[in-house]
Regions:
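Short S/T/G/P-rich N-terminal loop/turn motif that feeds into the first structured element of a domain
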Residues: 1-57, 61-72, 82-97
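Short, aromatic/basic amphipathic alpha-helical patches
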Residues: 75
Length: 97
């Protein structure tokens, strides 16, 4: 079952996101393709800034796929000083073009 992961918090800003992307991709400034992720299973990735701060929303094909990604991502977030845990929940519906 697909899962949704939302990252948002007071200690998470656009600069932090950009640094995490650089570390995940070996120096790229943007995530542009599912092949940029270190594990398979990503269905959708959206990042942007709103009234309540910077937010990242991912949809993964399964919780197991997200957990594999977390094994790489969470140490990076700790290294750059981001203390945010994702809000993770099952996708009730998923539609893509």
């Amino acid at each position: 079952m697909a899962v949704v992961a939302v990252f948002q918090g007071a200690s998470f800003a656009r600069d932090d996101y950009e640094e995490a992307v650089r570390r995940l991709t070996g120096g790229k400034s943007r995530m542009e393709s599912p092949s940029d992720w270190p594990v398979e299973g990503l269905l959708v990735h959206v990042a942007g800034e709103g009234a309540q701060g910077f937010r990242v929303l991912d949809v993964w094909e399964s919780e197991e796929a997200f957990n594999r990604f977390g094994e790489t991502l969470l140490p990076i977030l700790q290294e750059i000083g981001v203390d945010v845990s994702p809000d993770l929940y099952p996708a009730y519906a998923f539609v893509s073009a």
